[in-house]
From Swiss-Prot:
Residues 25-54 form the HNH domain. This is Probable mobile endonuclease C. It comes from Enterobacteria phage T4 (Bacteriophage T4). SUPFAM superfamilies: DNA-binding domain of intron-encoded endonucleases. GO terms for molecular function: DNA binding; endonuclease activity; zinc ion binding. To phage T4 mobB and mobD. Coiled coil: none annotated.
Amino acid sequence: MNYDRIYSNLVNSAEHPSKPRQTKAGYELHHIIPRSMGGSDDLDNLVFLTYKAHYTAHHLLAKIYGGKMYDAYWIMSNSKHRKVTSSQYAYAKAKKFENQRGAKRSDKTKKLMSIARSKVTLPDDFGKRISDGLTGRTLSTNHKEHIKNSSRNRFNTKTVIGYSPDGNTIELTGATEIRNAGFFHSAVYKCCKGIQSIHKGYTWKYKDEL
């Protein structure tokens, strides 16, 4: 299972905030590149995710990078504001203990892992990700850029055309240009995909599909 691709698709489908400290009912702000890995509070590194999607995002980050990402996943699993299954709770707790104590597991950790694995299907390369030394890993600048670019690449290479009811048109390329023009790029792309019919009075189409 390609967790990197799943994570990229998840953040790609989310909406970026239009201003610092913006809130949205029923959503939480998520750092595409976690702050613990050097991610910034820049708007292009932030997306709104539902509570469930936010939990899923941290689960994916934990599976991709291991180490301290399991600490964040455990915190979310242990929150009173989230409903998680007993197997999710056991798995998150076991991985946090494993991360704290290294490869040497206590009997308690082994028991938790056996409970979790009886209900959670792990990928074939899961053990390899841990053994490859991902624990406590710090991403290089190039790797950070790779993650950021992969999560935004689809948006940044698309040119869209907006049509107003009075016949005016506007041509914009990439999420930044769309935001600077006063539109929400996620809503614009939903219009282009046929998920949404109109955004701020405009209908939208991908230029390369006209």
